[in-house]
Amino acid sequence: MKLQRTLAPTSAPLSLSNLLSSLVGLLGGRKGRERLIGELQAKFQARGVFLVSSGKAALVLILKALAAGSERRRVIIPAYTCYSVPSAIVKAGLEVVLCDVNPRTLDFDFPELERLLDEKVLCVVPTHLFGLPADVRRVRQLCGVFGITVVEDAAQAMGAGSENRLVGTEGDVSFFSLG
């Protein structure tokens, strides 16, 4: 695999038609919201879609829901990720556990991830950083031994795919961000 040495852009130019379309969506009210939810459910074959203000807000809600009624308090994340991820874990009252990443893929260092997994881990958050698909199947396989939930962070990768699957469709729960 060739090592990518450029960073993805952090923004894209918006045309006047893009801006006007967003206003139509805002003014569309409930119908527009329901239409968006339906389209997202169809695209990602999701049982449920919830719209919240940000990826961080989504992750906090997911973590609080998972932690309710569980003694597990550790959340494993890649050591190289967006600041919002560990920030959300702390906001949810949980413990951040960092796992080294493979510098070629920016995915977990899988031998280290395997060593970190135990009955105290609530969930593992594979991250599709810069739109590069993480190996969620491998994470699920390792987590299955301990009954650990996989929370797929697709905040930077909506629409990206791997092996004929869209990112955000392999975790037990997933979240995206449009901002």
List PLM regions with ranges.
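Conserved PLP-binding active-site segment in aminotransferase class I/II-type PLP enzymes
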Residues: 1-70, 92
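Conserved donor sugar-nucleotide recognition element shared by glycan-biosynthetic enzymes
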Residues: 33, 55-59, 81-82, 106, ...
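A short beta-strand submotif of the Rossmann-like class I SAM-dependent methyltransferase core
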Residues: 51-54, 77, 126
